[in-house]
Amino acid sequence: MHLAIVGALTLVLTLFVLHYTTKDDRCYILINGHSAFTNCPASPDLAKVISQLKPHNHG
């Protein structure tokens, strides 16, 4: 169950990154391990994705 949730979240984040990196304004989100950076303007969609990024433990 946990892997399904992680897989679904990964897919959503990948699609979100592709959506924003293909726009003409070069908005992007870089996700590296447990950190992320974006130059995207604030939006309700961006806030929704960021709210799903929660610290977690692999142990």
From Swiss-Prot:
Entry-linked InterPro entries: TGBp3 (IPR003411)
Residue numbers on the Lumenal membrane side: 1-3
Coiled-coil parts of chain: none
Disulfide topology: none
Gene Ontology cellular component list: host cell endoplasmic reticulum membrane; membrane
Compartment(s) of residence: Host endoplasmic reticulum membrane
Alphabetical UniProt keywords: Host endoplasmic reticulum, Host membrane, Membrane, Transmembrane, Transmembrane helix, Transport, Viral movement protein
Residue numbers on the Cytoplasmic membrane side: 22-59
Biological processes, Gene Ontology terms: transport of virus in host, cell to cell
Segments traversing the membrane: 4-21
Further remarks about this protein from its record: TGBp1, TGBp2 and TGBp3 seem to act together for cell-to-cell propagation. TGBp1 is the main movement protein that physically cross the plasmodesma with the viral genome. TGBp2 and TGBp3 would facilitate TGBp1 function.
Annotated function: Plays a role in viral cell-to-cell propagation, by facilitating genome transport to neighboring plant cells through plasmosdesmata. May induce the formation of granular vesicles derived from the Endoplasmic reticulum, which align on actin filaments.
Record-stated family: Belongs to the Tymovirales TGBp3 protein family.
Name the record gives this protein: Movement protein TGBp3
Native organism: Clover yellow mosaic virus
